[in-house]
Amino acid sequence: MVKRLLLIFIGWFCMMEIAAQIHGVVVDANTGEPIPYLNIYYDGKGVGTVTNNDGEYSIAYHAGWTKLTFSMVGYETQEIIVSAKTSELNVRMKEIDQMLDEIIIRPKKEKYSRKNNPAVEMIKKVIASKRRTDLKQKDFYQYYKYQKIMFAKNNITADTLRESWLFKQYPFFRDQVEVCDVTGKNILPLSVDETVYENVYRKEPHSEKTYVRGINSTGVNELFSTGEMLTTVLKDVFQDIDIYQDRFRFLQYPFDSPISEAGIRFYKFYIMDTIYVERDKCFRLSFVPNNSQDFGFTGSLYILADSTYRVKQCQLNLPKKTDINFVDHMVIDQKFGELPTGEWTLLEDDMLCEMSYLKKVLGSFLVRRTTRYFDFNFDPLPNRLFKQKGKEIKDVNAMMRDNEFWSKYRQEDLTQSEQRMGSFVDDLTKIKGFKYVMFFLKALIENFVETSTPDSKVDIGPINTMITSNYIDGLRLRASAQTTANLNPHLFLKGYYAYGFKDKRSKYMGEVEYSFDKKEYLPREFPKHSMTFTYQYDNMLPSDKFIHTDKDNVFTSLKVCTVDQYNYERKATIKYEREREFGFKTTAFVRYANYEPCGKLFYRTMAGESQLQSAIANGRLSGTEWVHSPFNTHDITVAEASIAFRYAPGETFVNTKQRRLPVNLDAPVFSIQHTLSVKGILGSDYTYNMTDFSAYKRFWLNSWGNIDVYLKGGIQWNKVPFPLLIMPAANLSYIIQEETFNLINNMEFLNDRYASLDVSWNMQGKLFNRIPLLKKLKWREFIGVKCLWGKLTDKNNPFLEQNRNDNVLMMFPGHYNAAGGYDYSSYVMDPHKPYVEITAGIHNIFKLLHIEYVRRLNYNNLPTANKWGIRFMIRTVF
């Protein structure tokens, strides 16, 4: 039965048809030369395309749409009758000199120029008039926004409906299928999410707030405890577009608006004709990117043919040649109008996107976003609307709205399939054996196993940490679990037990977290306000604290070199965390920690080393292996208090069952932390102060991609042994880990002052697109450089004669050789010579795989230096 159910799901996602396509070449009737960037569209349907550089085009046939329009400035517009039998349609366009209200339109074969271009002059007038339509010039405004996002399986063919065993055996699948009124294709809606927002604005003192008044979500995403991830990602990827802004973010990329100064440089504009949109006479302007490979839209602007130069309607299409993953076809249609009070604003915003990945296996999907703006008010607003913290405030009852609420605020009726979504999901869950399929899928997707359905109180996992190995444990088995809000929405428990068959020791961790705010499923849901107590005993690499994944992740446990210097760490931590809605986070903790070296790592003070050498010289000790010398320090203990502040305005993320994953990488991040330990308090062996800071920012270079910059620095202010010095963030696995060095070994450089710079440039295929094969593969080039400046002051340098017999400083890590000599594996950096490594990579292989070659440029004379390596990562990006 389980196999049969798996086949059902495989069959479900494999349903697909090859849509009827009309293709051909458009040429100049006189010269026979192909015409690039010619508009081809179904008039009034909002669906169209443009020819490529060779005049070629392809557009889907839609049942019932019989007229295909071909138009281009300087040519006669042609309307050609098409049918389901039309597959190849080559068109010859006749040149003309058009005149539009005394504006001369020159033939297309002339070189495009922005100077003295009537279309460009018209766009400049639109830009000049933008301020008059800006609602933020008002003292106050208030309006409501209704948004619906529907996600569906796309392109269900008639043959599939008729012959597929899935539809034959389970009729409710057939009942869920409906026809998309835009594409004319059969679709199978899988989820629908409705949200009602109230937006308020005050000019002086400036304040903007968005209140989430209602949320209604149904669909297959509800079958997963972290199903809100789909909604969060869709909302971030398909953000609202405001063409009156100079730049907007969409598909996680910045786009220049066609009505911006940058847009004039980025796009080519053509005046097409004059038409009536509703009752308003408009100029229709078409625009295309200068380079079809650049991230930009094609489309049309309908400009009022009067002195206001307002945008009446905007249609945006994403060219298929644009180097964006997964998007087969996209159309955005925005309509503007005049309010009863005279203001001009956006009223309707519709988006439809057809997407696919591994199309022959998974088929294609459709995302449709419907947005309506209504109930505008420009009267003074009460102060209470602006007193809440944060820019977006969610009503406590937002997810519990009744039918009366939705009858009032729902601006677009749900389709029959959308109305049946709840019963469709119920029918899915009633299939015999369905729970076993979901068990498998949840373990695969969420990396956790739920102990009950539908409301799991305890989740077992992470699955990928159950069986691993390392130098200390040998074979390591681990069992982990965590409670959910279904057990208690405020109190959460988490822990694991692990056993190493080599050292024959048990390791464990227990955590109790109390959330002051009620949670829906996980304690890390934003905004976080909690108190946590954690107790842990385990073996750790000093570099484990730098990786973002679990240290027992089976994929990162495979190291690029032999790593044999570990600690047994026993930690007890009390931590307080408070996040604010505007992106500010405060973290404070008190920690007791005991570090016992293991493997090839040992602690020995410089005074202890002098005693050891004296004992050897006097014949009191013999041998060549002194890792377990009687003059070693068995362990060290510290008790520290720390306060940290983090500011990340505009940051968005999704919650998995393990951690948060950032969604909006455009948000800057700034943090600062100070840690204090006082000798004698809670058994601490040392007094020290440590200060750290970091900053991150992404910079976009238009069509040249983006540059990510990480800047970090820190100071250890006091004299401390090497375990408490600053060590580089080293990545010892083959998996790419951001914010780490790829070729620095475990504790290779020890400093008490440091600064690091990590700059990476993802060129988004700008160079590869000039190579035909690579252009077709959509590979993307990537380069980066990582630099580390470090300094070890005299007070912490064990190699100086003045510290030869110091009771605090310890020998740097290393290994005894066969001759009894000591080979250091940790070194002091030259403060005038930064460590540098560079990266050159190919991203987006199969739209999934990232491979990078890393090269170390200096400090290669060190005996432990790794000069180069290969790293990889699985990640999907648009």
Feature names for model-found ranges:
Residues 21-35:
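Structural motif
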Residues 32-36, 58-65:
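Short Pro-Gly-centered beta-turn/loop motif in secreted/extracellular proteins
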Residues 253-255, 378, 388-878:
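Exposed, low-structure sequence patches enriched in small/polar residues
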